[in-house]
């Protein structure tokens, strides 16, 4: 079990008095002062700890308790109820969150440098552990983060670990024991992280991260909302419903990450455009996951496909649950793959505008996930009995291609020339 020997005091949280903008939205990472809780004697659990019954782990990652605090109420981009008289389309609802985060990030100058801050032993160990987790579960992404500055790299690791722990709550070994109440407690714990009161060492790394960077809490809340949706929903009537789910569980990651990765000072793109690209990459990745895992999800009684589009293609739940690869299924899958690729194309626009040292991880993710769609096609659209995966050799070949794409300069007068230069190589 990984733990520190004393309370983690983040220089960014405890020493800095940083306010990104006087107009920053409420409950964002706008810190004037922070307090840290002390470790509970005897290793007792905090009120906001989230554990499955009979287990000392949170998902698959275990860390020792530090303490907790009451949560503050917050808004949530909740899924519409079936009886709502007027339902705002999911894309519009998500766009409001994008605008909120973009406005917060725009208040911090793109030319501002994230200066190195000495870390005490406890916080250094916390970030090191986050790096270990990232290396274990996302080897390719971990490798790509090595080009980033240490401050940005460690912050991305901290965000990755929090997202993984959150996902493990409903998709990990203890998922059958997780309830909506447990997710409520996890959200309370999130509030404490943003308030500078981490519960364990992994929380401390994220608490330090949100104190250093203009990160909005809303995407984190929304990811937890996606976990709630997974507990109670196994069908999606339309792509509008599926879009909201994909935003919750994956699009949020892009919105969390851009403030850390940073937008290139040379970029002429609007901040909102970059965030839309990050959102699109998250949506594309999740849609790809869904198309890859159709058979696996069906065996769990879940269908993450638009019901109305299945019906228009002449397909039913029974066809999916029985795993029938028919001409109708192939036609349906072609349309779903085309949609995912459209999101990948939109993601490219945002990836080019990031800081140069941050582009390689993003391009690596984009190119690798897009290859999964190629593998589904190569399997003749049989994603029931054959799981599409990218062979290791292709993954390794994608990394230098991603690196070359990362060298394309942001939107400027020389962008077209730069793209032509590298297009023949990638």
Swiss-Prot record:
Keywords: Carotenoid biosynthesis, Chloroplast, Isoprene biosynthesis, Plastid, Transferase, Transit peptide. CDD domains: Trans_IPPS_HH. It catalyses: 2 (2E,6E,10E)-geranylgeranyl diphosphate = 15-cis-phytoene + 2 diphosphate. The keyword Cytoplasm does not apply. Expressed in roots and endosperm. GO terms for cellular component: plastoglobule. Its main location: plastid. Signal peptide: none annotated. GO terms for biological process: carotenoid biosynthetic process. Its EC number is 2.5.1.32. Residues 1-52 form a transit peptide. It comes from the Eukaryota. Induction: Induced by drought stress, salt stress and abscisic acid (ABA) in roots. One of its GO terms (molecular function) is squalene synthase [NAD(P)H] activity. It is found in: Plastid, Chloroplast, Plastoglobule. The keyword ATP-binding does not apply. Pfam families: SQS_PSY. Belongs to the phytoene/squalene synthase family. Catalyzes the conversion of geranylgeranyl diphosphate to phytoene. Mediates the first committed step in carotenoid biosynthesis. May play a role in regulating carotenoid flux in response to abiotic stress in roots. May control flux to carotenoid precursors that are required for abiotic stress-induced abscisic acid (ABA) formation in roots. This is Phytoene synthase 3, chloroplastic. It comes from Zea mays (Maize).
């Amino acid at each position: 079990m990984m733990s520190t020997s004393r309370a983690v005091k983040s220089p960014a949280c405890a020493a800095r008095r940083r306010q990104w903008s006087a107009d920053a939205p409420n409950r964002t990472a706008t810190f004037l002062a922070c307090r840290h809780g002390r470790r509970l004697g005897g290793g007792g659990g905090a009120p906001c700890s989230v554990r499955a019954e009979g287990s000392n782990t949170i998902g698959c990652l275990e860390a020792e308790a530090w303490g907790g605090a009451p949560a503050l109420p917050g808004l949530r981009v909740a899924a519409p109820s079936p009886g709502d008289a007027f339902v705002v389309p999911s894309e519009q609802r998500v766009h409001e969150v994008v605008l909120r985060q973009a406005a917060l990030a725009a208040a911090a100058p793109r030319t501002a440098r994230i200066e190195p801050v000495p870390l005490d032993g406890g916080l250094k160990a916390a970030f090191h552990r986050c790096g270990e987790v990232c290396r274990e579960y996302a080897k390719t992404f971990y490798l790509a983060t090595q080009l980033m500055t240490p401050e940005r790299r460690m912050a991305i690791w901290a965000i990755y670990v929090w997202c993984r722990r959150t996902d493990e709550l409903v998709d990990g070994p203890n998922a059958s024991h997780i309830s909506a109440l447990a997710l409520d407690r996890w959200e309370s714990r999130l509030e404490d992280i943003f308030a500078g009161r981490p519960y364990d060492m992994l929380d401390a790394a994220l608490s330090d991260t949100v104190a250093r960077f203009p990160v909005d809490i809303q995407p984190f809340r929304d990811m937890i909302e996606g976990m709630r949706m997974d507990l109670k929903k196994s069908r999606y009537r339309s792509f509008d419903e599926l879009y909201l789910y994909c935003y919750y569980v994956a699009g949020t990651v892009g919105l969390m990450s851009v403030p850390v990765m940073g937008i290139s000072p040379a970029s002429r793109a609007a901040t909102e455009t970059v965030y839309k690209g990050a959102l699109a990459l998250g949506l594309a990745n999740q849609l790809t996951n869904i198309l890859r895992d159709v058979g696996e999800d069906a065996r769990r009684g879940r269908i993450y496909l638009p019901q109305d589009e299945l019906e228009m293609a002449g397909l039913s739940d029974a066809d999916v649950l029985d795993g029938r690869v028919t001409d109708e299924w192939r036609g349906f899958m072609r349309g779903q793959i085309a949609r995912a690729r459209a999101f990948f194309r939109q993601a490219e626009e945002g990836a080019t505008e990031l800081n140069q040292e941050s582009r390689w991880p993003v391009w690596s993710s984009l190119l690798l996930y897009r290859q999964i769609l190629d593998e589904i096609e190569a399997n003749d659209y049989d994603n029931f009995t054959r799981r599409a995966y990218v062979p290791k050799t292709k993954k390794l070949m994608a990394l230098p291609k991603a690196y070359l794409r990362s060298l394309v300069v942001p939107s400027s007068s020389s962008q077209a020339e730069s793209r032509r230069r590298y297009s023949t190589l990638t």
